């Protein structure tokens, strides 16, 4: 029986590894549903990394298993293996291939981040519209005669803020909705500057460009919505995050930065409405925000005692009536 050439076995193994790797990379089911425009970009990058990782795993583990079986010590063998040392072509190969893979993934990841708006210097002006400015930035915008040229140059050279900014299709445009997000131990507070609404949940319309101005009141927190593939630390210098939700629904908001003993309980939710439902929610909550009813300590105490409003009115009338009999 004619022996199959080693090249045929190598080619067959390469085809099998390639097919398995591509199948695993596109059918893994490891990620939650996609609910934002940024999610497909992140998922595509993850699929590529998983495909490459699967191929490397199969090649390395397959080679180990093959050599363990084929070159195992057999019965009656007492000698040692040949003292082989060094193989320049092989060493160059297994150094060059990982280096090329790392370079490719690094360049591609930067491209993905830029398409999401992360490293686009043109977004600095849009960030400055809503984000708090430092003293140096204020000096740069309103220079006085006493400001030296060196100080002005330093202010003008202030680097752009980084983070998840505006994607290229909305670059230079104002967001449809701005929300101030404050993280504190152990809650998220969402404030809508245009309406004065303050909420413990994030409400946004589907299909609209949303900008979050992130801040932390105590320690560092990290705003994470898995379905949006959106994770941004609330730290100085990275104040804004922009995204666009694509599916109506309710999704968890998680703090992904260890922030204290109850870090695991720092959760809330983002509710994505249709534009009509969002306007209804905003009108209802704006009325409450413009005329808040804050009960006094006395009112809360009376309510806890079960005293009716009529009885309170009678007591107050007697107390303010000079003709009433004093006990």
From Swiss-Prot:
Gene3D superfamilies listed in its UniProt record: 1.10.287.90, Cupredoxins - blue copper proteins
Known EC number: 7.1.1.9
Catalytic activity: 4 Fe(II)-[cytochrome c] + O2 + 8 H(+)(in) = 4 Fe(III)-[cytochrome c] + 2 H2O + 4 H(+)(out)
Top-level taxon of origin: Bacteria
Annotated residues for binding of Cu cation: 221, 255, 259, 263
Cited InterPro entries: CcO_II, CcO_II-like_C, Copper_CuA, Cupredoxin, Cyt_c_oxidase_su2_TM_dom, Cyt_c_oxidase_su2_TM_sf
Disulfide bonds: none
PROSITE patterns recorded: COX2, COX2_CUA, COX2_TM
Keyword Hydrolase: no
Subcellular location: Cell membrane
Cofactors demanded by this protein: Cu cation
GO biological process: ATP synthesis coupled electron transport
Pfam families, per database record: COX2 (PF00116), COX2_TM (PF02790)
Transmembrane segments: 56-78, 96-114
Signal sequence interval, chain numbering: 1-23
Cofactor binding annotation: Binds a copper A center.
Molecular function as annotated in GO: copper ion binding; cytochrome-c oxidase activity
Broad class of enzyme this protein falls into: translocase
Topology within the bilayer: Multi-pass membrane protein
Keyword annotations of the record: Cell membrane, Copper, Electron transport, Membrane, Metal-binding, Respiratory chain, Signal, Translocase, Transmembrane, Transmembrane helix, Transport
One GO cellular component, as annotated: plasma membrane
Function (record text): Subunits I and II form the functional core of the enzyme complex. Electrons originating in cytochrome c are transferred via heme a and Cu(A) to the binuclear center formed by heme a3 and Cu(B).
Family recorded in the similarity comment: Belongs to the cytochrome c oxidase subunit 2 family.
Protein name: Cytochrome c oxidase subunit 2
Organism expressing this protein natively: Thermostichus vulcanus (Synechococcus vulcanus)
Gene name tied to this protein: ctaC
């Amino acid at each position: 029986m004619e022996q199959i050439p080693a090249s045929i076995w190598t080619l067959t193994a390469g085809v099998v590894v390639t097919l398995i790797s591509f199948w695993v990379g596109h059918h893994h089911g490891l990620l939650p549903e996609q609910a934002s425009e940024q999610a497909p970009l992140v998922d595509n990058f993850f699929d590529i990394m998983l495909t490459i990782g699967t191929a490397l795993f199969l090649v390395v583990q397959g080679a180990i298993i093959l050599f363990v079986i084929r070159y195992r010590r057999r019965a009656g063998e007492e000698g040692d293996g040949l003292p082989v040392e060094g193989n320049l072509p092989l060493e160059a190969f297994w150094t060059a291939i990982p280096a090329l893979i790392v370079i490719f993934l690094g360049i591609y990841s930067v491209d993905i981040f830029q398409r999401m708006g992360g490293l686009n210097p043109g977004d600095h002006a849009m960030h400055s519209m809503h984000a708090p400015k430092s003293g140096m930035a204020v000096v740069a915008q309103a220079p006085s005669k006493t400001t030296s040229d060196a100080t002005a140059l330093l202010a003008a050279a202030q680097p752009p803020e980084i983070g998840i900014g505006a994607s290229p299709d909305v670059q230079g445009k104002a967001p449809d909705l701005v929300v101030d997000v404050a993280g504190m131990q152990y809650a998220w507070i969402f404030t809508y500057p245009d309406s004065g609404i303050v909420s413990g949940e994030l409400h946004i319309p589907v299909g609209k460009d949303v900008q979050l101005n992130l801040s932390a009141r105590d320690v560092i927190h990290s705003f994470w919505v898995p379905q949006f593939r959106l994770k941004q630390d609330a730290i100085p210098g990275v104040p804004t995050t922009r995204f666009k939700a694509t599916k109506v629904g309710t999704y968890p908001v998680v703090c992904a930065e260890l922030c204290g003993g109850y870090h695991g309980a720092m959760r809330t939710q983002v509710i994505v409405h249709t534009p009509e439902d969002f306007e209804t929610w905003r009108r209802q909550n704006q009325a409450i925000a413009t005329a808040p009813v804050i009960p006094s300590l006395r009112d809360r105490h009376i309510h806890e005692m079960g005293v009716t409003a009529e009885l309170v009115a009678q007591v107050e009338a007697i107390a303010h009536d000079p003709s009433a009999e004093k006990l």
